[in-house]
Protein backbone atom coordinates (compact mmCIF):
# COMPACT_ATOMS: atom_id res chain seq x y z
CA UNK A 1 0.00 0.00 0.00
CA UNK A 2 1.46 3.34 -1.06
CA UNK A 3 1.48 6.24 1.33
CA UNK A 4 3.19 9.52 0.48
CA UNK A 5 2.67 11.15 3.84
CA UNK A 6 5.74 12.43 5.61
CA UNK A 7 6.99 9.92 8.15
CA UNK A 8 6.84 11.19 11.74
CA UNK A 9 8.81 9.77 14.64
CA UNK A 10 8.70 6.00 14.96
CA UNK A 11 8.56 4.37 18.36
CA UNK A 12 10.62 1.19 18.45
CA UNK A 13 11.00 -1.53 21.04
CA UNK A 14 13.86 -4.01 20.93
CA UNK A 15 14.37 -7.51 22.27
CA UNK A 16 17.49 -9.03 23.79
CA UNK A 17 18.49 -5.71 25.35
CA UNK A 18 21.53 -7.27 27.02
CA UNK A 19 22.64 -9.14 23.88
CA UNK A 20 25.16 -8.09 21.25
CA UNK A 21 22.60 -6.86 18.73
CA UNK A 22 20.29 -5.38 21.37
CA UNK A 23 23.11 -3.20 22.67
CA UNK A 24 24.22 -2.23 19.17
CA UNK A 25 20.71 -1.14 18.17
CA UNK A 26 20.52 1.00 21.32
CA UNK A 27 23.84 2.68 20.44
CA UNK A 28 22.79 3.23 16.84
CA UNK A 29 19.19 4.37 17.37
CA UNK A 30 20.13 7.38 19.52
CA UNK A 31 21.73 9.02 16.47
CA UNK A 32 18.72 8.62 14.16
CA UNK A 33 16.24 11.50 14.48
CA UNK A 34 13.20 9.60 13.16
CA UNK A 35 13.57 6.91 15.82
CA UNK A 36 12.38 7.03 19.42
CA UNK A 37 13.64 4.02 21.36
CA UNK A 38 10.84 3.71 23.90
CA UNK A 39 11.34 0.27 25.40
CA UNK A 40 13.48 -2.86 25.42
CA UNK A 41 12.95 -6.43 26.51
CA UNK A 42 15.02 -9.04 28.30
CA UNK A 43 14.22 -12.65 29.16
CA UNK A 44 11.56 -13.40 31.77
CA UNK A 45 12.98 -13.00 35.29
CA UNK A 46 16.30 -11.81 33.86
CA UNK A 47 18.78 -10.18 36.21
CA UNK A 48 18.96 -7.35 33.64
CA UNK A 49 15.35 -6.26 34.24
CA UNK A 50 14.89 -2.55 35.12
CA UNK A 51 18.32 -1.61 33.71
CA UNK A 52 18.73 1.67 31.85
CA UNK A 53 19.35 0.52 28.27
CA UNK A 54 21.88 3.29 27.70
CA UNK A 55 24.02 2.07 30.58
CA UNK A 56 23.50 -1.52 29.44
CA UNK A 57 24.85 -0.57 26.01
CA UNK A 58 27.90 1.09 27.61
CA UNK A 59 26.87 4.62 26.67
CA UNK A 60 25.07 7.26 28.77
CA UNK A 61 21.76 6.84 30.66
CA UNK A 62 18.78 7.56 28.40
CA UNK A 63 15.92 7.01 30.84
CA UNK A 64 14.51 3.90 29.16
CA UNK A 65 14.47 0.77 31.29
CA UNK A 66 14.30 -2.90 30.37
CA UNK A 67 11.22 -5.02 30.94
CA UNK A 68 10.73 -8.79 30.89
CA UNK A 69 7.10 -8.81 29.73
CA UNK A 70 6.04 -7.51 26.32
CA UNK A 71 2.47 -7.01 27.59
CA UNK A 72 3.75 -4.25 29.89
CA UNK A 73 5.09 -2.20 26.96
CA UNK A 74 2.31 -2.88 24.43
CA UNK A 75 1.20 0.76 24.23
CA UNK A 76 4.75 2.14 24.05
CA UNK A 77 5.92 0.99 20.61
CA UNK A 78 4.90 0.90 16.94
CA UNK A 79 7.57 -1.48 15.63
CA UNK A 80 9.33 -4.32 17.43
CA UNK A 81 12.90 -5.14 16.33
CA UNK A 82 13.86 -8.69 17.24
CA UNK A 83 17.24 -10.45 17.19
CA UNK A 84 16.85 -13.36 19.61
CA UNK A 85 16.16 -17.08 19.13
CA UNK A 86 13.64 -18.89 16.97
CA UNK A 87 11.51 -19.79 20.00
CA UNK A 88 11.51 -16.26 21.45
CA UNK A 89 11.02 -14.64 18.06
CA UNK A 90 7.91 -16.72 17.34
CA UNK A 91 6.48 -15.79 20.75
CA UNK A 92 7.06 -12.09 20.04
CA UNK A 93 5.60 -12.51 16.56
CA UNK A 94 2.46 -14.11 17.99
CA UNK A 95 2.03 -11.13 20.34
CA UNK A 96 2.52 -8.64 17.50
CA UNK A 97 0.03 -10.55 15.36
CA UNK A 98 -2.64 -10.51 18.07
CA UNK A 99 -2.03 -6.85 18.92
CA UNK A 100 -1.52 -5.56 15.36
CA UNK A 101 2.06 -4.44 15.93
CA UNK A 102 4.67 -4.21 13.17
CA UNK A 103 7.78 -6.35 13.48
CA UNK A 104 11.33 -6.46 12.13
CA UNK A 105 12.74 -9.99 12.37
CA UNK A 106 16.51 -10.44 12.39
CA UNK A 107 16.48 -13.87 14.00
CA UNK A 108 17.63 -16.70 11.72
CA UNK A 109 17.22 -20.47 11.73
CA UNK A 110 13.50 -20.77 10.98
CA UNK A 111 12.37 -23.99 9.32
CA UNK A 112 10.03 -24.20 6.31
CA UNK A 113 6.85 -24.38 8.40
CA UNK A 114 7.91 -21.40 10.51
CA UNK A 115 8.67 -19.37 7.38
CA UNK A 116 5.16 -20.18 6.13
CA UNK A 117 3.77 -18.96 9.44
CA UNK A 118 5.63 -15.64 9.10
CA UNK A 119 4.23 -15.24 5.59
CA UNK A 120 0.71 -16.04 6.80
CA UNK A 121 0.92 -13.51 9.64
CA UNK A 122 2.07 -10.81 7.22
CA UNK A 123 -1.47 -10.80 5.78
CA UNK A 124 -2.62 -9.09 8.98
CA UNK A 125 0.45 -7.11 10.10
CA UNK A 126 3.52 -5.60 8.43
CA UNK A 127 6.63 -7.76 8.82
CA UNK A 128 10.17 -7.11 7.64
CA UNK A 129 12.25 -10.28 7.62
CA UNK A 130 15.80 -10.63 6.36
CA UNK A 131 18.51 -13.25 6.77
CA UNK A 132 21.07 -10.44 6.64
CA UNK A 133 20.50 -6.70 7.24
CA UNK A 134 23.84 -5.67 5.74
CA UNK A 135 23.48 -3.67 2.54
CA UNK A 136 26.76 -5.12 1.24
CA UNK A 137 25.56 -8.71 1.62
CA UNK A 138 22.31 -7.89 -0.14
CA UNK A 139 24.20 -6.28 -3.01
CA UNK A 140 26.10 -9.58 -3.37
CA UNK A 141 22.78 -11.42 -3.66
CA UNK A 142 22.02 -9.19 -6.65
CA UNK A 143 25.44 -9.66 -8.23
CA UNK A 144 25.01 -13.41 -8.04
CA UNK A 145 21.96 -13.24 -10.30
CA UNK A 146 24.33 -12.29 -13.12
CA UNK A 147 27.59 -13.95 -12.21
CA UNK A 148 26.02 -17.30 -11.37
CA UNK A 149 25.54 -17.88 -15.11
CA UNK A 150 29.21 -18.88 -15.20
CA UNK A 151 28.15 -21.92 -13.20
CA UNK A 152 26.81 -23.33 -16.46
CA UNK A 153 30.39 -23.90 -17.56
CA UNK A 154 30.98 -27.65 -17.55
CA UNK A 155 34.14 -27.98 -15.44
CA UNK A 156 33.53 -25.61 -12.55
CA UNK A 157 33.24 -26.06 -8.80
CA UNK A 158 31.25 -23.68 -6.63
CA UNK A 159 31.95 -23.42 -2.90
CA UNK A 160 30.67 -21.19 -0.11
CA UNK A 161 32.72 -20.65 3.05
CA UNK A 162 31.12 -18.85 5.99
CA UNK A 163 32.80 -17.84 9.26
CA UNK A 164 31.07 -16.60 12.41
CA UNK A 165 31.68 -16.28 16.14
CA UNK A 166 31.58 -19.47 18.18
CA UNK A 167 28.26 -18.55 19.84
CA UNK A 168 26.29 -18.57 16.57
CA UNK A 169 24.03 -21.60 16.75
CA UNK A 170 22.63 -22.05 13.23
CA UNK A 171 24.97 -23.98 10.93
CA UNK A 172 25.21 -23.22 8.07
CA UNK A 173 24.25 -19.56 8.35
CA UNK A 174 20.97 -18.36 6.86
CA UNK A 175 22.96 -15.99 4.65
CA UNK A 176 25.03 -18.82 3.13
CA UNK A 177 21.86 -20.83 2.48
CA UNK A 178 20.35 -17.82 0.72
CA UNK A 179 23.53 -17.36 -1.34
CA UNK A 180 23.30 -20.99 -2.43
CA UNK A 181 19.61 -20.62 -3.35
CA UNK A 182 20.34 -17.49 -5.40
CA UNK A 183 23.07 -19.26 -7.37
CA UNK A 184 21.06 -22.44 -7.99
CA UNK A 185 18.04 -20.43 -9.11
CA UNK A 186 20.01 -18.97 -12.01
CA UNK A 187 21.81 -22.12 -13.15
CA UNK A 188 20.64 -24.08 -16.17
CA UNK A 189 22.43 -27.23 -15.07
CA UNK A 190 22.41 -29.11 -11.77
CA UNK A 191 25.39 -28.27 -9.59
CA UNK A 192 26.48 -29.49 -6.18
CA UNK A 193 27.35 -26.40 -4.15
CA UNK A 194 29.18 -27.10 -0.91
CA UNK A 195 28.89 -24.89 2.18
CA UNK A 196 31.71 -25.00 4.73
CA UNK A 197 31.04 -23.44 8.14
CA UNK A 198 33.54 -22.15 10.69
CA UNK A 199 32.62 -21.10 14.23
CA UNK A 200 35.54 -19.48 16.00
CA UNK A 201 36.43 -16.58 18.28
CA UNK A 202 34.39 -13.40 17.89
CA UNK A 203 34.19 -13.25 14.09
CA UNK A 204 31.15 -11.10 13.30
CA UNK A 205 30.52 -12.51 9.85
CA UNK A 206 32.32 -13.45 6.65
CA UNK A 207 30.96 -15.11 3.52
CA UNK A 208 33.11 -16.18 0.59
CA UNK A 209 31.82 -17.58 -2.71
CA UNK A 210 34.43 -19.38 -4.84
CA UNK A 211 33.99 -20.26 -8.53
CA UNK A 212 36.90 -22.60 -9.39
CA UNK A 213 37.84 -23.29 -13.02
CA UNK A 214 40.73 -25.24 -14.48
CA UNK A 215 43.77 -23.11 -13.61
CA UNK A 216 41.90 -20.10 -12.20
CA UNK A 217 39.17 -19.00 -9.82
CA UNK A 218 36.85 -16.11 -8.97
CA UNK A 219 36.17 -15.14 -5.35
CA UNK A 220 33.45 -12.88 -4.00
CA UNK A 221 33.81 -11.99 -0.32
CA UNK A 222 31.71 -10.03 2.12
CA UNK A 223 33.12 -9.18 5.56
CA UNK A 224 31.22 -7.53 8.39
CA UNK A 225 33.61 -5.50 10.54
CA UNK A 226 31.06 -4.52 13.19
CA UNK A 227 27.41 -5.05 14.11
CA UNK A 228 26.48 -1.45 13.40
CA UNK A 229 25.78 -2.35 9.76
CA UNK A 230 23.12 -4.85 10.88
CA UNK A 231 21.65 -2.39 13.39
CA UNK A 232 21.40 0.34 10.73
CA UNK A 233 19.73 -2.08 8.35
CA UNK A 234 17.21 -3.14 11.00
CA UNK A 235 16.41 0.47 11.91
CA UNK A 236 15.93 1.37 8.24
CA UNK A 237 13.60 -1.63 8.05
CA UNK A 238 11.57 -0.22 10.95
CA UNK A 239 11.35 3.12 9.14
CA UNK A 240 10.26 1.26 5.99
CA UNK A 241 7.42 -0.41 7.91
CA UNK A 242 6.20 2.86 9.41
CA UNK A 243 3.71 3.53 6.60
CA UNK A 244 2.85 -0.10 5.86
CA UNK A 245 -0.19 -1.83 7.32
CA UNK A 246 0.36 -5.38 6.09
CA UNK A 247 2.82 -7.34 3.96
CA UNK A 248 6.11 -9.22 4.10
CA UNK A 249 9.17 -7.16 3.18
CA UNK A 250 12.93 -7.68 2.94
CA UNK A 251 16.10 -5.77 2.10
CA UNK A 252 15.46 -6.01 -1.64
CA UNK A 253 12.50 -3.65 -1.21
CA UNK A 254 14.78 -0.97 0.27
CA UNK A 255 17.46 -1.53 -2.40
CA UNK A 256 14.84 -1.28 -5.16
CA UNK A 257 13.61 2.03 -3.78
CA UNK A 258 17.15 3.39 -3.51
CA UNK A 259 17.86 2.34 -7.10
CA UNK A 260 14.71 4.13 -8.32
CA UNK A 261 15.64 7.27 -6.39
CA UNK A 262 19.15 7.17 -7.89
CA UNK A 263 17.77 6.88 -11.43
CA UNK A 264 15.30 9.72 -10.90
CA UNK A 265 18.10 11.99 -9.70
UniProtKB/Swiss-Prot annotation:
Its main location: cytoplasm. It is an enzyme of class 1 (oxidoreductase). NADP(+) binds at residue 43. Keywords: Amino-acid biosynthesis, Cytoplasm, Diaminopimelate biosynthesis, Lysine biosynthesis, NAD, NADP, Oxidoreductase. GO terms for molecular function: 4-hydroxy-tetrahydrodipicolinate reductase; NAD binding; NADP binding; oxidoreductase activity, acting on CH or CH2 groups, NAD or NADP as acceptor. InterPro entries: DapB_C, DapB_N, DapB_N_CS, DHDPR_bac, NAD(P)-bd_dom_sf. The active site is at residues 164, 168. NAD(+) binds at residues 16-21, 106-108, 130-133. One of its GO terms (cellular component) is cytosol. It is found in: Cytoplasm. (S)-2,3,4,5-tetrahydrodipicolinate binds at residues 165, 174-175. It catalyses: (S)-2,3,4,5-tetrahydrodipicolinate + NAD(+) + H2O = (2S,4S)-4-hydroxy-2,3,4,5-tetrahydrodipicolinate + NADH + H(+); (S)-2,3,4,5-tetrahydrodipicolinate + NADP(+) + H2O = (2S,4S)-4-hydroxy-2,3,4,5-tetrahydrodipicolinate + NADPH + H(+). Its EC number is 1.17.1.8. GO terms for biological process: diaminopimelate biosynthetic process; lysine biosynthetic process via diaminopimelate. This is 4-hydroxy-tetrahydrodipicolinate reductase. It comes from Wigglesworthia glossinidia brevipalpis.
